[in-house]
């Protein structure tokens, strides 16, 4: 399934046009709420917004690259910079969504015990660990195994390959024999692990909702709030990481599905602000947490 270059260009441009204002508004809204009362959820939302804004800024260049059928339009030395700006948020976003889901689950399932550890300083530490983990893992994989890396033994610039047509390509002409295991390791640690955490927390939140005293309407809304993070992981970032697994299992699969996965991943900059903004506004799990906390106090 190979999309026409014009369609890929249009999808990247649309994601940028929608994602940039949405993420700016999300960051401004989270900052305004943080000035009144900083919570762990706001810390995760701020870091997710900054990560998505970095991805959004890289989308115009990705659109130009798609219109040129994958040819790299800038100097070769800028390919590593683009790789960090584009691929780092794709993986870091899953970590922030998993952290946000874990905080919501702990607040709903263990309201009394979680209150003792519900401090923003701990959340900042979690976010710093996510930034460091993703950056170090990406740096090791790209620096060692990418075209022009330490293990590649070629004279090209880092990340740059020149296929038979003579046009330089940034990362997308990577040798499948080395690209498959490298990308699979990234997906395994930085996507499937956060996905498993988010899914577990979603199920736990549903169980907490089933035992709560909320009305049916509020239960439905809270269930949607709890599932927002899981939804964006599956719909946006899931296809890209599925293509990484497929290319690892079948090295000769081709890059068509990867191109489609990169486009769906770009649209996470549109869905993520909607998910975090809705989580911040809705009564959902905050109401559950408050109700269960009050119930715990009344039992004493």
Curated annotation (Swiss-Prot):
User: What is reported on the regulation of this protein's activity?
Assistant: The receptor is strongly activated by gamma-linolenic acid, while myristate gives a lower response. It is also activated by phytanic acid and pristanic acid. Is also activated by synthetic agonists, such as TAK-875 (fasiglifam); this compound is a partial agonist and potentiates the activity of the endogenous ligand gamma-linolenic acid.
Glycan-bearing residues: 155
A Pfam family reported for this protein in Swiss-Prot or TrEMBL: 7tm_1
Q: What outcome is documented for mutating residue 44 to F in this protein?
A: Reduces response to synthetic agonists
Let me know which tissues express this protein, per UniProt: Detected in brain and pancreas. Detected in pancreatic beta cells.
The effect annotated for residue 137 to A is: Reduces response to linolenic acid. Reduces response to synthetic agonists
Q: Which UniProt keywords apply?
A: Cell membrane, Disulfide bond, G-protein coupled receptor, Glycoprotein, Lipid-binding, Membrane, Receptor, Transducer, Transmembrane, Transmembrane helix
> Which CDD domains does this chain map to?
7tmA_FFAR1
Effect of substituting residue 145 to A: Constitutive receptor signaling
Q: Outcome of residue 123 to A?
A: Reduces response to synthetic agonists
Extract one GO molecular function annotation from the record.
Answer: lipid binding
Extract one GO cellular component term from the record: plasma membrane
InterPro entries listed in its UniProt record: GPCR_Rhodpsn (IPR000276), GPCR_Rhodpsn_7TM (IPR017452), GPR40-rel_orph (IPR013312), GPR40_recept_FA (IPR013313)
Q: What is the effect of changing residue 12 to A?
A: Reduces cell surface expression and response to linolenic acid and synthetic agonists
Q: What biological processes does GO assign it?
A: G protein-coupled receptor signaling pathway; glucose homeostasis; insulin secretion; ligand-gated ion channel signaling pathway; negative regulation of interleukin-1 beta production; phospholipase C-activating G protein-coupled receptor signaling pathway; positive regulation of calcium ion transport; positive regulation of cytosolic calcium ion concentration
Query: Which residue ranges run through the membrane?
Result: 9-31, 42-64, 80-101, 122-142, 179-200, 224-248, 257-279
Residues in compartment: Cytoplasmic: 32-41, 102-121, 201-223, 280-300
Query: Site described as Important for receptor activation, positions?
Result: 145, 172
User: Where is this chain primarily localised?
Assistant: membrane
Give the record's membrane topology.
Answer: Multi-pass membrane protein
Topological domain ranges for the Extracellular compartment: 1-8, 65-79, 143-178, 249-256
* Domain of life assignment: Eukaryota
Which pairs are disulfide-linked?
79-170
This molecule's function is given as:
G-protein coupled receptor for medium and long chain saturated and unsaturated fatty acids that plays an important role in glucose homeostasis. Fatty acid binding increases glucose-stimulated insulin secretion, and may also enhance the secretion of glucagon-like peptide 1 (GLP-1). May also play a role in bone homeostasis; receptor signaling activates pathways that inhibit osteoclast differentiation. Ligand binding leads to a conformation change that triggers signaling via G-proteins that activate phospholipase C, leading to an increase of the intracellular calcium concentration.
User: What family does this chain come from, according to its entry?
Assistant: Belongs to the G-protein coupled receptor 1 family.
The name on file for this protein is Free fatty acid receptor 1
- Source organism per UniProt: Homo sapiens (Human)
Recall the taxonomic lineage recorded for the source organism: Eukaryota, Metazoa, Chordata, Craniata, Vertebrata
């Amino acid at each position: 399934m190979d999309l026409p270059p014009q369609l890929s260009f249009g999808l990247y441009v649309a994601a940028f046009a929608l994602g940039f204002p949405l993420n700016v508004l999300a960051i401004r809204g989270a900052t305004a709420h943080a000035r009144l009362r900083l919570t762990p959820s706001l810390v995760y939302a701020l870091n997710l917004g900054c990560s998505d804004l970095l991805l959004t800024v890289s989308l115009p260049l990705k659109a130009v690259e798609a219109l040129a059928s994958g040819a790299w339009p800038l100097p070769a030395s800028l390919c590593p910079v683009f790789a960090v700006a584009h691929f780092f948020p794709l993986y870091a976003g899953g970590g922030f969504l998993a952290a946000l889901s874990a905080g919501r689950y702990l607040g709903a399932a263990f309201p009394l015990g979680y209150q003792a550890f519900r401090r923003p300083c701990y959340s900042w530490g979690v976010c710093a660990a996510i930034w460091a983990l993703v950056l170090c893992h990406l740096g090791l994989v790209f620096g060692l195994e990418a075209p022009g890396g330490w293990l590649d033994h070629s004279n090209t610039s880092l990340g740059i390959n020149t296929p038979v047509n003579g046009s330089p390509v940034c990362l997308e002409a990577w040798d499948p024999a080395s690209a498959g295991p490298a990308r699979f390791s990234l997906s395994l640690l930085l996507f499937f692990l956060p996905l498993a955490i988010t899914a577990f927390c979603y199920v736990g939140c549903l169980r907490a909702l089933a035992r709560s005293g909320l009305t049916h309407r509020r239960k439905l809304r809270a269930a949607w709030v709890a599932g927002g993070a899981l939804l964006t992981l599956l719909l946006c970032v899931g296809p890209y990481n599925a293509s990484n697994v497929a290319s690892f299992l079948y090295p000769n699969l081709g890059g068509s599905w990867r191109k489609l996965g990169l486009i769906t991943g770009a649209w996470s900059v549109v869905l993520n602000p909607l998910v975090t903004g809705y989580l911040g506004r809705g009564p959902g799990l905050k109401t559950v947490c408050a109700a269960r906390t009050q119930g715990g106090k009344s039992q004493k």
